[in-house]
């Protein structure tokens, strides 16, 4: 877990959620620096969550943000399992339907922004509904 300094100067442990939120903010800023536009964050649909929804031109980009301190267990990108991909696809499908769209009518893709240590890896079109 990450730590942050407090007013007293002693570090305080961040919760897993706080750590995840901080990396999602970093990913959003990083992607905006690459020209993507922010749409939404932490989108929940029936138990699934999408970290970020961005736009690149006319493409809706669903982004999964991952962080690992090291590559010891495969790094951040390797942690997006088939099961997680399935859940992200289902959540995106529901979000699109709520916004009068579908995979057939909206140009979209699924990206992963993976932070491993101090490295950033942007995997465009990491998986799709045909995977």
From Swiss-Prot:
InterPro entries linked: Restrct_endonuc-II-like (IPR011335), tRNA_endonuc-like_dom_sf (IPR011856), UPF0102_YraN-like (IPR003509)
Chain segments carrying region Disordered: 1-20
SUPFAM superfamilies: Restriction endonuclease-like (SSF52980)
Molecular-function GO terms, alphabetical: nucleic acid binding
Biased composition (Polar residues): 1-19
Annotated family: Belongs to the UPF0102 family.
Protein name in the entry: UPF0102 protein YraN
